[in-house]
Amino acid sequence: MAPNLRKSHPLLKMINNSLIDLPTPSNISAWWNFGSLLGICLATQILTGLLLAAHYTADTTLAFSSVAHTCRNVQHGWLIRNLHANGASFFFICIYLHIGRGLYYGSYLYKETWNTGVILLLTLMATAFVGYVLPWGQMSFWGATVITNLFSAVPYIGQTLVEWAWGGFSVDNPTLTRFFTLHFLLPFMIMGLTLIHLTFLHESGSNNPLGIVSNCDKIPFHPYFSLKDILGFMLMLLPLMTLALFSPNLLGDPENFTPANPLVTPPHIKPEWYFLFAYAILRSIPNKLGGVLALAASVLILFLAPLLHKSKQCTMTFRPFSQLLFWTLTANLLILTWVGSQPVEHPFIIIGQLASLTYFTILLILFPIIGALENKMLNY
């Protein structure tokens, strides 16, 4: 009998072991769809991004006009740009849900997979930030100015660091050029990191909603989960296309329709919606260095998740108190997102500070305590 090419060819064998004959737990729910959705997001973003880069000019005098030209004169340029801008939002929706799934079901106990995932999140955030600067509108310019300025909070070398990042004494042409370079480069880095992420995942195999070893009951990835993933793609592409075609500017900032002007500061500088929770945490501390440290900690805290797991059970499926805490954390993040979009005025300042405190308290203190408490309850 002739050998099956799919199983013997060096390249096809790798694809086969990752996407076709991969043993997969039979009970994984729709929450396990987001990994493949993130893959689709990345592919879409790279494709639309390459097409946009072909028409973009990384120069302060031409950047804004080149984006307008793409939307007006390039075949379907408006659609490509709208898909790219809103695709970023869907990328973040998927990654936040993916991380939420990981926290809920204890996937962080697969340490290598989890840590590469957090590095992926950081790289994605960097990519989105530098990408937002490229259209060179008012919010692009002032967002870049405010966020890069945070490096000046680093003791001793801060100011040097900022000027080195800017390539001058303010955000200007060199800054735009290097941001374009980074925005082009980082997605390919994300691709590489994704392969590492998947390599680590396939070492241990997938987690499942029960959090128990499922080796005795695994099924091939294809056709079961390949079909389920295609359903997921459809359900994501539908709202993405709806947003891109019906209200493409819904999630953007109207300030970005005005070309960048260093002499006029927008009344309220704020990042895109997916960074608002971190921005709220940054603003809630009245000290610059303290704010920067809190901002960094708000994301880097994910690295600590495996160390803070005190429960005897992997998932939260049978842990009602941890579940309550998890959904409180979710609500808290939504409050932070809302506060980040509001001006720095009386009620919002204190709400932001309380929400920031709650965020760190839940993750660092309450989760381990409740986990240990639930272990005690197992004895009764």
Curated annotation (Swiss-Prot):
Gene Ontology biological-process entries: mitochondrial electron transport, ubiquinol to cytochrome c
Required cofactor names: heme b
Pfam family, one: Cytochrome_B
Primary localization: mitochondrion
GO terms for cellular component: mitochondrial inner membrane; respiratory chain complex III
The keyword Chloroplast belongs to this UniProt entry's keyword annotation: no
UniProt cross-references to SUPFAM superfamilies, sorted A to Z: a domain/subunit of cytochrome bc1 complex (Ubiquinol-cytochrome c reductase) (SSF81648), Transmembrane di-heme cytochromes (SSF81342)
Binding site for heme b b562: 84, 183
Chain residues that bind heme b b566: 98, 197
UniProt keywords, alphabetically: Electron transport, Heme, Iron, Membrane, Metal-binding, Mitochondrion, Mitochondrion inner membrane, Respiratory chain, Transmembrane, Transmembrane helix, Transport, Ubiquinone
Membrane association type: Multi-pass membrane protein
Entry coiled-coil feature ranges: none
Xref: CDD domains: cytochrome_b_C (cd00290), Cytochrome_b_N (cd00284)
Function description: Component of the ubiquinol-cytochrome c reductase complex (complex III or cytochrome b-c1 complex) that is part of the mitochondrial respiratory chain. The b-c1 complex mediates electron transfer from ubiquinol to cytochrome c. Contributes to the generation of a proton gradient across the mitochondrial membrane that is then used for ATP synthesis.
Note: Heme 1 (or BL or b562) is low-potential and absorbs at about 562 nm, and heme 2 (or BH or b566) is high-potential and absorbs at about 566 nm.
Name under which the protein is recorded: Cytochrome b
Origin species: Antigone rubicunda (Brolga crane)
Annotated gene: MT-CYB
